[in-house]
Amino acid sequence: MKLLDTTVLLDFLSGEEEKVETIEQFFEELSQKGEKLFVPEEVIIELVYFLEHGYKWEREDIYEVVETILNDELFNVELKPFIREAIKLYSKRQGTFLDCLKSVKAKKMGIKEVVSFGRRFKKLGFKTVNPYEES
């Protein structure tokens, strides 16, 4: 198994024909050998961030890319069920991808309140506790 860095995915999605073809061939060779690429959750977080903020992709398109990665046998995605649930929330405009991921993890732990200055977690179904406001 090899660790996959975000930059490779960004190059693959860049639309630059030469980069896309080279990486596609590399992925195909790995797949034929039965090798896997480890994709830590941080890679998915970075990928979503750069596609949204750097490349100005729409959330629906980002959702499709992440789902493709999650469903491809070549990629061993860390915390796959959490990522899958978070990207669904994100695609429905429930918050930033990182907030969606945090909320999925918190809900799995039975957490119902978030200590935060913002109100953005209310959209995700949490009670917000602001340390500067009275309890």
From Swiss-Prot:
Keywords in alphabetical order, please. Hydrolase, Magnesium, Metal-binding, Nuclease, Toxin-antitoxin system
The answer on whether this UniProt entry bears the keyword Nucleus reads no
On the tree of life, the source organism's domain of life is Bacteria
Transmembrane parts of this sequence: none
The PINc domain is annotated at 3-130
Pfam families named among the record's database cross-references: PIN (PF01850)
What does it do? Toxic component of a type II toxin-antitoxin (TA) system. An RNase.
Can you say what this protein is called?
Answer: VapC ribonuclease aq_1901
